């Protein structure tokens, strides 16, 4: 009975973070749609660029979380499997993020976003941070730490939403009133960049909350890594 109770509790926590994430997406979409500074073309750009992020994130993680779950079940390989997965994803993510960052002046016009290189640089940051957190989050699930898993995900969502509201609603309102603290840095034409920046802050929050799980970064068991 205690096992079933624990399983039910974990399911609730994992489900809660997923449900809240979906709810927030439903909340943000109409906020973007009815915003006075996000027109239909910008909304299309936002949707398209986020689709790229979802696809590229697979490359950033190389599905190492699946390898970790497989080899982490072997008690003698638990720590080594985690360190291998963490170090691999960390290295690949930095490498790919740097490529996108420096190649942005060529990537942007090739995809129809000439002069908007900042979008791709911010997306590189989002994907890098999300990839960094993927293995630690997998470890939380592996260890049954559902509360910490849900807390991390919910803080990410909370920070993302707060900054979305700030950039999409508060800043344009203050900008229209010529508040100098806003007008000297805020540019409504780059609202998509601010939305991505909000996601960077959310992902950075997860990274900070999971920082203790990066202690094994750099430790590699090459023999086990070849199997993984």
Residue ranges and their predicted role:
Residues 3-65, 93-104, 126, 161, ...:
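Signature of the first transmembrane helix
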Residues 4-5, 33-43, 56-88, 135, ...:
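Transmembrane-helix boundary and interhelical linker motifs in polytopic inner-membrane proteins
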Residues 34-35, 95-114, 171-183:
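Short membrane-interface helical motifs at transmembrane helix boundaries
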């Amino acid at each position: 009975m205690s096992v079933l109770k624990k399983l039910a509790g974990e399911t609730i926590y994992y489900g809660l973070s997923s449900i809240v994430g979906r709810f927030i997406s439903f909340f943000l979409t109409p906020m973007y749609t009815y915003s006075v500074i996000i027109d239909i073309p910008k909304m299309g750009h936002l949707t398209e660029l986020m689709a790229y992020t979802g696809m590229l994130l697979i490359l950033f993680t190389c599905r190492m979380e699946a390898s970790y779950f497989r080899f982490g079940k072997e008690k003698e390989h638990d720590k080594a499997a985690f360190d291998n997965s963490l170090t691999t994803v960390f290295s690949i993510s930095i490498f790919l993020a740097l490529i996108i960052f420096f190649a942005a002046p060529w990537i942007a016009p090739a995809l129809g976003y000439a002069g908007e290189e900042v979008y791709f640089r911010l997306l590189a940051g989002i994907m890098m941070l999300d990839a960094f957190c993927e293995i630690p989050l997998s470890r939380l699930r592996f260890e049954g730490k559902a509360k910490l898993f849900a807390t991390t995900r919910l803080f990410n969502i909370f920070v993302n939403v707060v900054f979305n509201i700030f950039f999409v609603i508060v800043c344009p309102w203050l900008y229209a009133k010529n508040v100098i603290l806003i007008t000297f840095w805020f540019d409504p034409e780059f609202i998509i960049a601010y939305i991505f920046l909000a996601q960077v802050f959310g992902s950075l929050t997860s990274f900070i909350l999971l920082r203790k799980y990066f202690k094994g970064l750099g430790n590699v068991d090459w023999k086990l890594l070849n199997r993984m």
